[in-house]
Amino acid sequence: MALARCVLAVILGALSVVARADPVSRSPLHRPHPSPPRSQHAHYLPSSRRPPRTPRFPLPLRIPAAQRPQVLSTGHTPPTIPRRCGAGESWGNATNLGVPCLHWDEVPPFLERSPPASWAELRGQPHNFCRSPDGSGRPWCFYRNAQGKVDWGYCDCGQGPALPVIRLVGGNSGHEGRVELYHAGQWGTICDDQWDNADADVICRQLGLSGIAKAWHQAHFGEGSGPILLDEVRCTGNELSIEQCPKSSWGEHNCGHKEDAGVSCVPLTDGVIRLAGGKSTHEGRLEVYYKGQWGTVCDDGWTEMNTYVACRLLGFKYGKQSSVNHFDGSNRPIWLDDVSCSGKEVSFIQCSRRQWGRHDCSHREDVGLTCYPDSDGHRLSPGFPIRLVDGENKKEGRVEVFVNGQWGTICDDGWTDKHAAVICRQLGYKGPARARTMAYFGEGKGPIHMDNVKCTGNEKALADCVKQDIGRHNCRHSEDAGVICDYLEKKASSSGNKEMLSSGCGLRLLHRRQKRIIGGNNSLRGAWPWQASLRLRSAHGDGRLLCGATLLSSCWVLTAAHCFKRYGNNSRSYAVRVGDYHTLVPEEFEQEIGVQQIVIHRNYRPDRSDYDIALVRLQGPGEQCARLSTHVLPACLPLWRERPQKTASNCHITGWGDTGRAYSRTLQQAAVPLLPKRFCKERYKGLFTGRMLCAGNLQEDNRVDSCQGDSGGPLMCEKPDESWVVYGVTSWGYGCGVKDTPGVYTRVPAFVPWIKSVTSL
C-alpha cells in the first residue's frame, strides 16, 4: 500500500511538471490571464486566430510606446508557428524580396495567383503587416509585382530595423499631401531641394500606393510645423524605401517650411491626365489614360478654359497652351478631339468631346501645356485666363480675368493704350490696341480682381504688369476697364464728306441691333449716327449734358425748346457734341462744336409744352461744320403733315437719359410703338395737342419710356426704303416708365415748313 502511494505521488508530480511546461496543451478557450476590458484598439475572439486590430498609419512602423495605441494580448501562439514577424513596434511589412506589403483593405477581390491560405479574416484590415492567417505556415502578405499586378510573397521575419514611418498630410485625399516622416519621436518634413518625380515614385511605393507619382514643391499642400528632417533627397526611382536613397543626414538642411516637399499618387483610372515629354513636371504634352494606355489630345477647338481645367486637375491654378514641338514626340494613340470644358469639371472626361479614339488629327496637333501655381499675392502666373465681354465683336470688350475660380474685372485707374496692347498681345492680336475706361462696355457683375495695374506695353501677358495684391481695389464696376484690339481708325476726309452728303440722309452705315432707355439697352457704336447732345460750356458748368439732339445736316441740329429754359438762349453758353458714344471717354469720331445760333419756335411758351421745338446752327465755314463719317450722319426729315402711324415702322428712341438706376454713360436705345392719337388724348386730356404724338410700351413688365436726360433727343422710325426719319423730339411725360403714361414727343411733320424756312434744307 505504501508502495502504491509512492508510485501515485511520482505520477502526479510528473503530470504537474508537464502541465507547467506545456501551456499549449490547455484548451484554446482557456486564458491564463484575466480578460482585459474591450478597447477601440483590440478586437476579441474566443481563440487566437484573429490578430489584434490596430489603428492605421500610412506605414505603421516603429512608433514610441508612449504614442502607440494599446495592444492587448489575445492568447498564446505556438512558438513553432510564427503568426507574425516581430511584435509591438517592430512588426514586419515587407516581403523577403524587400517589396512593401499592400494594406489588407486595398487587395482586390479577384487575384491571378491564389495565396497559400485563406485570408478572409484579414480582408478589410487597415494595415499592411505580415500575417499567417490560419497559423499553419510562414507569415506572408500581398504586394505589387514588377508588372504592376497584385501578387503575394512570404515575409522575412528577420528583416531588421523597421523603415521610417511616412504619412501624407494636407491633401484632398489619402493619395496626396505633404510628405512627413516620423523620426526621433516627432513628425517632420522633407525639403524640396532636388525633389522630383523619382523621389515621389519611391514615396508612393513605400506607402503601397499605385498610379501616377508626382512631386510637388514650395509647400504645395501647406507648410509643416515640425522639424525639417531631410534635404537633398536624390532617388533614382527604383528604391523600395526612402532609406535607400542618397540624402542628407537626419536634421541637416538649409530650408524653411515654404520648401516642404509633397507627392501625389494618383490611381490610374480612365480620364486621368498627365504632362509628358517636358523638361519639368509642370509642362509637356497633355496625355489622358484610357483602357490601360496613355494617349494624346488633339488641339481642335482648344480654348483657354480647357487649359485652365487641365492644369487645375493637375494641381495647378493656371496655364497656357504651348507648342507641342517643344516637347518630346509621341507615338501613342490620339484619344480625344474637339474637347470643350466649362470650368466646373472634376474629371477631364466630364468635358464635352468626341468619342474615345475619334479624331481627324495628327500628332502635330497634340495639345501641349505649361502650367503654373497660384498667385503669390503680388503677381499672377502667366497664362491665367482672360476674356473680352460685351463688345460688338470678339476683338473688343470689358476685360475679365479668371482668378480663384471666378471671372472678375479690372479697375481702370491708370488704364491706358499700353495696358490694351498687353491684353491684346496675350489674346493673340497683333494690330493697334486702344484702351477704354469708365465701363465703356458695360459694368461687370463679379469681383473686381485688380487695380492700379502698371504696364510698359512690352509685356507678354497681363500677369507681368500686376503690382498690387489681387483683390485689393478702391473701385466700383462703373470703372471697369476695356480694350479694342486690331483697332482701325476711320475718319472721313473732306471728299468723303461730299460723298456722304450726296448719298442722302437717314443712312446707317454700320451694323445695327434692336434691343431695348427704361427697358432699353446699350446701342452699338455708330448705330445712331445722327444722335447729338447739347452741352453747357465751361463758363456755366463742367460741359455736362443738358439735352439730346438730332443732326439734320453738317451745320443744323434739332432739339427741344425747353432745353434753353434754365440757361437762356445765348449761343456762347452751349456746345454740341456729335459722334459720341460714351459720355466720359473721348473717342476718335467724337466732335464738340460751338453754337453759332439758337432758333426757338416763336409760339413756344416756357409755361406750356406746346411748340416745344428749336433749331441750333453750329459754328463752321459755309456748310461745313461737323465732319461727316460713318459715326456722324444726318437724319431725314418727314413729309409735311405725314402720319407716321401709317407710313413708318420700327421706331426707336435714343439718348443718355435715366435707365431706371442712374443716368447712362453709354448711348441707350429702345424700341417703342407709336400710339393712336385718341389714346394719348384720353391719357393727357387738354395737355395733348395736334402738334404732339406719344409712344411707348405700356405693359407692366415691358415698359419703355424716354426720360429727363433724353429731352430734345430723337424719336426715329424706319421707312420701307430703309432710311431713318426723325418723327419726334422728346418733350415731356409723367415721370419715367410710369404705367399707362407714355412719353410725349413734338410731332416733327407739323413743323417741316418752319424747319426748312430756317435751315434752307
UniProtKB/Swiss-Prot annotation:
Record SMART domains: KR, SR, Tryp_SPc
InterPro entries from the UniProt entry: Kringle, Kringle-like, Kringle_CS, Kringle_sf, Peptidase_S1_PA, Peptidase_S1_PA_chymotrypsin, Peptidase_S1A, SRCR
GO process terms (BP): exocytosis; proteolysis; zymogen activation
Domain SRCR: 166-267, 273-373, 386-487
Annotated spans, Zymogen activation region: 505-516
Cellular location(s): Secreted
GO molecular function annotations of the record: peptidase activity; serine-type endopeptidase activity
This protein's name: Neurotrypsin
